[in-house]
């Protein structure tokens, strides 16, 4: 079954909202269940974004070379974030529940940390590259503005993380808030036609 643009936009919106709800749940409760939910939604969200971006690329007839580059960068995001979060859920927290002391530099959410670096590469570098390839390959002016803005935010957050952990938080404005706004915009435009 081919996913159309409206369904992709709705999926993107639902995925982002579910992600933000899971994040808020963890920030409020600080429970292992909420953290597992948040990490699971991060992986699921990456897959939803991959599908949504590929549908957008098809609908707006992005050039084949740029579509391939986009697919590679999206796959990088999905693969790396899956490695980071599945390692956190399946290894790190299991070791901790067994009483093993795991150094912070192996934990997601700690800085500096191996898992956070993997996630920063996934969401900062590869997702930034994805937005930039969309910008380069699409003719629609509004989507170009959204995509270049989101791409720059992701890449600035990625580069900023080398200097300070707090500079990383520029990136979620691109892949989180920006992607949500872009999906809402696409949905509203699709409904107006």
Q: What are the functions of these language-model segments?
A:
Residues 1-193:
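Hydrophobic, aromatic-enriched alpha-helical segments typical of multi-pass transmembrane helices
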């Amino acid at each position: 079954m081919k996913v159309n643009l409206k369904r992709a936009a709705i999926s993107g919106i639902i995925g982002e909202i579910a992600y933000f709800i899971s994040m808020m749940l963890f920030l409020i409760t600080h429970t292992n269940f909420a953290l597992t939910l948040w990490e699971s939604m991060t992986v699921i969200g990456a897959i939803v974004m991959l599908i949504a971006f590929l549908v957008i690329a098809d609908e707006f007839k992005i050039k084949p070379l740029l579509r391939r580059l986009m697919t590679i960068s999206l796959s990088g995001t999905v693969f790396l974030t899956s490695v980071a979060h599945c390692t956190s859920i399946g290894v790190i927290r299991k070791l901790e529940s067994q009483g093993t002391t795991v150094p912070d530099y192996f934990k997601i959410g700690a800085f500096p940390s191996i898992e956070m670096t993997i996630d920063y590469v996934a969401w900062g570098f590869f997702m930034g590259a994805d937005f930039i390839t969309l910008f380069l390959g699409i003719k629609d002016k509004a989507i170009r503005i959204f995509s270049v803005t989101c791409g720059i935010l992701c890449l600035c957050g990625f580069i900023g993380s080398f200097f300070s952990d707090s500079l990383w938080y520029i990136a979620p404005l691109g892949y989180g808030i920006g992607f949500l706004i872009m999906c809402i915009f696409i949905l509203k435009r699709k409904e107006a036609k």
